[in-house]
Amino acid sequence: LMGEAIDATGIQFKLLNRSRGPAVWSPRAQADKHRYSNWVRDALKREKGISWIRGRVDSVLVKDSKINGVSLSTGACYYCKALVVTTGTFLNGIIHIGPEQHAAGRVGEPPARALAESLKALNFRWGRLKTGTPPRVHQSSIDFTQLSIERGDQDPVPFSFMTNSLEGNQIDCYLAHTNERVHSLVRQNLNKSPLFNGQIQGIGPRYCCLLYTSDAADE
């Protein structure tokens, strides 16, 4: 399903590492996130045997040491013999934006605090993972003449075997480079980063690391 979804909503397709052997070829696609979400929703709604109920799950119901269902914030209960919880970033989620932090599942959405406490009470092992999101810049604020164009593949390869061909125009990407002035500004403001001022405890990703973690390592 995910392969079909990206084939239908992708805005650029590119096969990475093409200059090397097939073993390391890596297909990459960028999607219109709103179209992607809507496409998946509509595809699932067409499936038989699936009922859709919108609401916030606050607790997991257990009876005789077996799963029995869930209760929603509205007080409604739905009973089942098996339950799959796809938590994403919502369980007691925290967002850090520079020195500021607040509870959230993701930007603009509240965290799932009650569900987190319910799972803790059932003695699930608990941990926390970190994700990083690059800052967004407004298109009108960018001087594209100073950037290098990176176009998608002329004959892109679909992600799904069920897709015969990819249709629609692709959108160009642009490559920018930093310089010593940028690196100097980053180093001067490392104390404002939650990774360095103690707000976040843990180790960041090894690959695709943030610019300022690279600068800190170079010092």
Can you say where each PLM-predicted feature lies in the sequence?
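Conserved N-terminal/central alpha/beta ligand/cofactor-binding core
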Residues: 1-59, 86-103, 110, 114-116, ...
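A short, glycine/Asx- and small/polar-enriched loop/turn
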Residues: 62-68
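Core beta-strand elements of the Rossmann-like FAD/NAD(P) dinucleotide-binding domain
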Residues: 73-82
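Residue-level recognition of phosphate/Mg2+-coordinating polar/acidic sites
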Residues: 191-192
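Amphipathic alpha-helical blocks
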Residues: 198-211
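Conserved small/polar residues in nucleotide/adenosyl-binding loops
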Residues: 212-219
